[in-house]
Amino acid sequence: MALKITQVKGTVGTRKKQKDNLRSLGLKRIRHSVVQPDTPQVRGMINVVRHLVTVEEVAGE
């Protein structure tokens, strides 16, 4: 199982930890999407920036 993560809000006014987590997930701008594996580490990063992204489950890796 994999997760499609899309950034829906910008990073102006957010904390450094949140910006760093977005970069670690591979997100650089609004409406940019990446597919990441469904692991506890990725879920933890998503939890930190949950107000800035949307997450969808997709089949495959």
From Swiss-Prot:
Q: Which CDD domains match?
A: Ribosomal_L30 (cd01658)
Cellular component per GO, a single term = cytosolic large ribosomal subunit
Q: Which UniProt keywords apply?
A: Ribonucleoprotein, Ribosomal protein
Q: Which InterPro entries match?
A: Ribo_uL30_ferredoxin-like_sf, Ribosomal_uL30_bac-type, Ribosomal_uL30_ferredoxin-like
Might you name a Gene Ontology BP term for this protein? translation
Instruction: Name the Pfam families for this protein.
Output: Ribosomal_L30
Region Disordered: start-end pairs: 1-20
Listed name of the protein:
Large ribosomal subunit protein uL30
Gene name in the database record: rpmD
